[in-house]
Curated annotation (Swiss-Prot):
Classification via PROSITE patterns: RIBOSOMAL_S11 (PS00054)
Principal subcellular localization: plastid
Name of this chain's protein: Small ribosomal subunit protein uS11c
Places the protein is found: Plastid, Chloroplast
Similarity comment: family membership: Belongs to the universal ribosomal protein uS11 family.
One term under GO cellular component: ribonucleoprotein complex
PANTHER family, sorted: 40S RIBOSOMAL PROTEIN S14/30S RIBOSOMAL PROTEIN S11
Gene name of the encoded protein: rps11
Assembly and binders: Part of the 30S ribosomal subunit.
SUPFAM superfamilies noted in UniProt: Translational machinery components
An annotated GO BP: translation
Lineage: Eukaryota, Viridiplantae, Streptophyta, Embryophyta, Tracheophyta
Keywords, comma-separated and alphabetical: Chloroplast, Plastid, Ribonucleoprotein, Ribosomal protein, RNA-binding, rRNA-binding
InterPro entries recorded: Ribosomal_uS11 (IPR001971), Ribosomal_uS11_bac-type (IPR019981), Ribosomal_uS11_CS (IPR018102), Ribosomal_uS11_sf (IPR036967)
Length: 138
Protein backbone atom coordinates (compact mmCIF):
# COMPACT_ATOMS: atom_id res chain seq x y z
CA UNK A 1 0.00 0.00 0.00
CA UNK A 2 1.59 3.27 -1.08
CA UNK A 3 1.15 6.52 0.77
CA UNK A 4 -0.45 9.45 -1.04
CA UNK A 5 1.98 12.28 -1.80
CA UNK A 6 0.86 15.66 -0.51
CA UNK A 7 1.07 18.59 -2.91
CA UNK A 8 1.78 21.26 -0.29
CA UNK A 9 5.07 22.41 -1.79
CA UNK A 10 3.90 22.64 -5.37
CA UNK A 11 5.77 24.56 -8.01
CA UNK A 12 3.26 27.39 -8.17
CA UNK A 13 4.48 29.15 -5.04
CA UNK A 14 8.19 28.82 -5.82
CA UNK A 15 10.00 31.88 -7.17
CA UNK A 16 11.39 31.23 -10.63
CA UNK A 17 14.64 33.07 -11.26
CA UNK A 18 13.59 36.40 -9.77
CA UNK A 19 16.24 38.00 -7.61
CA UNK A 20 16.18 40.95 -5.27
CA UNK A 21 17.48 43.57 -7.66
CA UNK A 22 15.65 46.53 -6.11
CA UNK A 23 18.17 46.90 -3.30
CA UNK A 24 20.59 49.83 -3.60
CA UNK A 25 24.06 48.95 -2.33
CA UNK A 26 26.39 51.97 -2.10
CA UNK A 27 29.23 50.10 -0.35
CA UNK A 28 30.20 46.43 -0.36
CA UNK A 29 32.91 43.82 0.06
CA UNK A 30 34.45 41.91 -2.85
CA UNK A 31 35.87 38.53 -1.85
CA UNK A 32 38.31 36.88 -4.29
CA UNK A 33 39.26 33.27 -3.61
CA UNK A 34 42.06 32.28 -5.98
CA UNK A 35 43.12 28.64 -5.88
CA UNK A 36 45.34 26.91 -8.40
CA UNK A 37 42.29 25.25 -10.00
CA UNK A 38 39.65 28.00 -9.99
CA UNK A 39 38.91 31.60 -9.01
CA UNK A 40 35.68 32.51 -7.20
CA UNK A 41 34.59 36.15 -6.86
CA UNK A 42 31.78 36.95 -4.40
CA UNK A 43 30.33 40.42 -3.84
CA UNK A 44 28.55 41.02 -0.52
CA UNK A 45 27.09 44.00 1.26
CA UNK A 46 28.60 45.30 4.50
CA UNK A 47 26.63 42.82 6.62
CA UNK A 48 27.92 39.86 4.59
CA UNK A 49 24.81 39.03 2.56
CA UNK A 50 25.74 37.80 -0.92
CA UNK A 51 24.67 40.15 -3.70
CA UNK A 52 26.45 38.60 -6.67
CA UNK A 53 29.02 35.91 -7.38
CA UNK A 54 30.86 34.35 -10.27
CA UNK A 55 33.61 31.84 -10.86
CA UNK A 56 35.81 30.83 -13.74
CA UNK A 57 33.78 27.62 -14.06
CA UNK A 58 30.46 29.43 -14.41
CA UNK A 59 31.98 31.71 -17.05
CA UNK A 60 32.49 28.69 -19.30
CA UNK A 61 36.09 27.74 -18.57
CA UNK A 62 36.69 24.03 -18.03
CA UNK A 63 39.63 21.96 -16.82
CA UNK A 64 43.01 23.59 -16.39
CA UNK A 65 41.82 26.81 -18.06
CA UNK A 66 39.83 27.68 -14.93
CA UNK A 67 43.04 28.49 -13.07
CA UNK A 68 44.34 30.98 -15.64
CA UNK A 69 44.55 34.74 -15.05
CA UNK A 70 42.22 35.46 -17.99
CA UNK A 71 39.53 33.25 -16.46
CA UNK A 72 39.87 35.12 -13.15
CA UNK A 73 39.57 38.45 -14.94
CA UNK A 74 36.40 37.29 -16.70
CA UNK A 75 34.89 36.00 -13.45
CA UNK A 76 35.63 39.27 -11.63
CA UNK A 77 34.10 41.44 -14.34
CA UNK A 78 30.99 39.21 -14.49
CA UNK A 79 30.44 39.43 -10.73
CA UNK A 80 30.95 43.20 -10.64
CA UNK A 81 28.77 44.02 -13.64
CA UNK A 82 25.55 43.26 -11.73
CA UNK A 83 26.47 45.23 -8.60
CA UNK A 84 27.52 48.30 -10.58
CA UNK A 85 23.98 48.29 -12.02
CA UNK A 86 22.65 48.21 -8.44
CA UNK A 87 24.61 51.35 -7.61
CA UNK A 88 27.75 50.15 -5.84
CA UNK A 89 30.37 52.90 -5.76
CA UNK A 90 32.79 51.93 -2.96
CA UNK A 91 34.13 48.53 -1.99
CA UNK A 92 36.68 46.70 0.10
CA UNK A 93 38.60 43.84 -1.51
CA UNK A 94 39.65 40.71 0.38
CA UNK A 95 41.88 38.31 -1.52
CA UNK A 96 42.40 34.75 -0.34
CA UNK A 97 44.57 32.02 -1.81
CA UNK A 98 47.80 31.48 -3.74
CA UNK A 99 46.34 31.15 -7.25
CA UNK A 100 47.34 32.77 -10.52
CA UNK A 101 44.12 34.77 -10.70
CA UNK A 102 44.84 37.08 -7.74
CA UNK A 103 46.39 39.95 -9.66
CA UNK A 104 44.19 39.57 -12.74
CA UNK A 105 41.01 39.70 -10.66
CA UNK A 106 42.26 42.77 -8.79
CA UNK A 107 43.11 44.45 -12.10
CA UNK A 108 39.59 43.77 -13.39
CA UNK A 109 38.07 45.17 -10.18
CA UNK A 110 40.18 48.35 -10.47
CA UNK A 111 39.10 48.81 -14.09
CA UNK A 112 35.39 48.52 -13.20
CA UNK A 113 35.23 52.06 -11.80
CA UNK A 114 34.44 51.12 -8.18
CA UNK A 115 36.45 53.10 -5.61
CA UNK A 116 38.46 50.69 -3.45
CA UNK A 117 38.82 51.69 0.19
CA UNK A 118 41.40 48.98 0.87
CA UNK A 119 42.77 45.71 -0.48
CA UNK A 120 43.47 43.10 2.18
CA UNK A 121 45.14 39.69 1.86
CA UNK A 122 43.24 37.24 4.07
CA UNK A 123 45.05 34.06 3.02
CA UNK A 124 45.02 31.67 5.99
CA UNK A 125 48.56 31.00 7.21
CA UNK A 126 49.16 28.20 9.73
CA UNK A 127 51.21 28.93 12.83
CA UNK A 128 52.66 25.42 12.49
CA UNK A 129 49.29 23.70 12.83
CA UNK A 130 48.41 20.59 10.83
CA UNK A 131 50.98 18.57 8.93
CA UNK A 132 50.85 19.45 5.22
CA UNK A 133 50.25 16.78 2.57
CA UNK A 134 53.26 15.00 1.12
CA UNK A 135 55.07 16.61 -1.81
CA UNK A 136 54.05 15.54 -5.31
CA UNK A 137 56.47 13.47 -7.37
CA UNK A 138 55.75 13.89 -11.05
Amino acid sequence: MTKPISRIGSRRNVRIGSRKSGRRIPKGVIHVQASFNNTIVTVTDIRGRVVSWSSAGTCGFRGTRRGTPFAAQTAASNAIRTVVDQGMQRAEVRIKGPGLGRDAALRAIRRSGILLSFVRDVTPMPHNGCRPPKKRRV
